[in-house]
């Protein structure tokens, strides 16, 4: 199992109660599940609308294997223009 730094932005940071933490998992899905378990339903609801980046690249598959020491960014939709 690897550890990854997960960074939350905007509404995701508010729902998690932090803007960064280190969580363990083998895949992006496992890390996000650990985050949901740690922070509850509010974060789970926000994650449904978020984009997720692993090592700076968009992830659309929760089975993506994380690289040791990787960063996972959780980005809610942004409004404005």
Predicted regions and their residues:
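Ubiquitin-like/PB1-type beta-grasp interaction modules and other compact soluble beta-rich domains
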Residues: 1-80
């Amino acid at each position: 199992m690897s550890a990854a730094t997960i960074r939350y932005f905007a509404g995701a940071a508010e729902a998690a109660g932090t803007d960064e933490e280190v969580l363990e998992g083998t895949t992006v899905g496992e890390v996000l599940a650990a985050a949901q378990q740690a922070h509850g339903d509010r974060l789970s609801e926000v994650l449904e609308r978020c984009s997720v980046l692993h090592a700076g690249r968009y992830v659309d598959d929760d089975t993506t294997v994380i690289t040791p020491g990787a960063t996972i960014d959780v980005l809610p939709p942004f409004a404005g223009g």
